[in-house]
Amino acid sequence: MKNFAYLKGAVLFGATSALIGCLPPALGQPTNSMPPVSERPKRPTPPTRDPHTPGYVTATELPDGEVPAADAEGNFIIGATHHAAPEMVAQTNVPQGTVYNFTMSSADSKIFPGIARDPNTFGTGDPIDPTRMVVTTSHPEAYTRRVAVYVPQQYVPGRVAPFIVGADGPDRMLFTALDNLIAEHRVPVMIAISIGNGSGDAQGSERGLEYDTMSGRYAEFVEQEVLPLVESKYHVTLTTDPEGRATMGGSSGGSCALSMAWYHTDLYHRVLTYSGTYVNQQWPHNEETPHGAWGYHETLIPNSAAKPIRIWLEVGDRDLLNPNSMHDNMHDWVVANERMAQVLAAKGYHYQFIFARNAGHTDRAVKQQTLPEALEWLWQGYQPPAK
């Protein structure tokens, strides 16, 4: 493992919010008929969805440029202009946290030893059961993942700290927002752990296995293999109270963030997702959850007692629509997130749902506009332990 650290300066680092969750353009074709990547046509731009479409949730439309209040619950529509919030710019008069980086090798993992698809190959829809994806080119393969750990300047060594775990790291936008929000006492003094994925995307890849699997496996990986390293390397003490633990991610990283809490409410109670992949993307197929993360709004949340989970979620009006990937009618990200809002409301969850106009999948501008409010909303009601 390699590790190093740097002190965040007064310049906003070029954050990467490309949390990729889309499927390849020709995913429904047999792999042996796939043309070279360079010859495949580009995926058409998704249609722009109207937030007032019949069947969508009833939502409060905010003036352009505004975001909901940090204590507001329910459904909101934000306008087409997405300026970065002031908290997304590093301030010279604000204490800057330190970001440490280290790498993890698949050779050291008992939970995720590593898989990958052959280059330029994808799955094909099962001709008998359109809800299944057939992948024949996935094989064991090693990987190295990067982990970034943000420790705020206000952290007192030895004190138990709340924390947030993020997918598809490193997420430097998160670290900048936390610097400013912590300084303004709008969120608790917390550690942020931004974990890189194990490479690839979608069915048959390591990232797909980690993020799209409907189980507590990824939460267990974080608990058993990541958090102990964070504590030992950087001399921080992470809380074991699920009220002081949050997860976040975009696309498949978003559905993964929910899975971490859903399957392990003993570990996490707070979830934040951008363009969550609440669609049928799980592989390998699991008869217990045959429709993958589409099952959250289809059966799991409606048919289960409400869990102690607080969730903030967002979708863009031009978010992903992949109707031909598996011909299962379960690959519309806008519909999936709209239905998430419906079932969360019906079950009495504390949630805030944002429908963003003029926004694509895991839209960077939307994240820069909304992340400070989202984080402040996420940590509402948290009571830090007595000093």
Model-derived regions, located:
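N-terminal secretory signal peptides that target proteins for export/translocation
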Residues: 1-7
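Boundary at the C-terminal end of the N-terminal hydrophobic targeting segment
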Residues: 26-30
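Non-catalytic cap/lid and distal C-terminal segments of serine-dependent acyl enzymes
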Residues: 46-50, 54-56, 62-387
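A short, flexible low-complexity segment enriched in Lys/Arg and Gly/Pro that occurs
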Residues: 34-46
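Bacterial N-terminal signal peptides
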Residues: 10-21
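Alpha-helical and His/Cys-centered functional microenvironments
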Residues: 10, 33, 365
